[in-house]
Each structure stands twice: as structure tokens, then as C-alpha cells.
Amino acid sequence: MKLADLSPPGQTVVTGSLLFTAEDIIAFAEKYDPQPFHTDPEAAKNFVFGGLCASGWHTCAGWMKMFVSYWAKEHARLVAEGIEPPKLGPSPGFKKLQWLKPVYAGDTITYSVTLIESRPLMSRPGTLINLTANQGVNQKGETVLRFESTVLEFD
């Protein structure tokens, strides 16, 4: 089975939702993005965001966490049904990354992926390159994150 057969271009798949707690935001930021508006709730009040908010990289990591979890379940489902899952990976990269709104402590972000196109990779026979649009939306329906990514697929 090919990815485009499983999820045709234009069809959006919700991969999961993630609650961003103050504790998680601080722990991630202390390790990877130690800026006061990510690590100190009191200091964060005096910055442009007006409160503690997640690092953009944390929101991206949340997307990856939800995608990996979703794909593991989908892969297992297909195998259980006797269907050979698409052979995906690695990703050559991403582009157009935008952090559109801050993600605050207490926000729940719902992540999704939409296949835009799947085409043969001319330099590698038997390989497709899939382009996807990805996003995260908060509980108010506001898009907080979006980017495009590519993933290889093999025969």
C-alpha cells in the first residue's frame, strides 16, 4: 500500500492532542530553549507574550510525538488487517515553519497532517517523495504552528 492510497492528497488526518503544562514547558525550555518567557512564570509576565509559553521547538516536538504515536498505531492496524503498510522514511527536510501564536500553559494542541502530493523521485527509481502540510491548533481553534515536510517512501 502507498501513503496516497491510505490518505489521499487533500485529506487531513488528526494525529493527536497534547496538553502543555507549565511543568512540561519549563522542563523542555530548561533543556533546549532557556529563555525567561519559557522558564520563569513571573518573569514571563513582563515579556511580549504576557505569560509562560512553550518554546516553538517544544510545539514542533509535540507534533512529532503525536505523529510517531499515530503512525505506530496505524502501522499495527494495517498489519493486523493483513495489509502491507507504506514504507516511509527518512525525511529530507521541512520548510515554511511558522509559529503563529504562543502556546501557553494549559493549552491543548491538536496536531494534523495533510498529504499535498506524492510523486516519483526521479533520482531514485522505486522511491516516492511525499509532501505534507502539518499544523497544530489550540483549543480555541487557532492555528499555532504550521509547516511543510517531505518524507521518502519506498517500493
Task: Describe the residue ranges of each PLM region.
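Short, Lys/Arg-enriched charge-dense amphipathic segments
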Residues: D40, A61-A80, Q98-T108, S112, ...
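Hot-dog-fold acyl-thioester-processing enzymes
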Residues: M1-P92
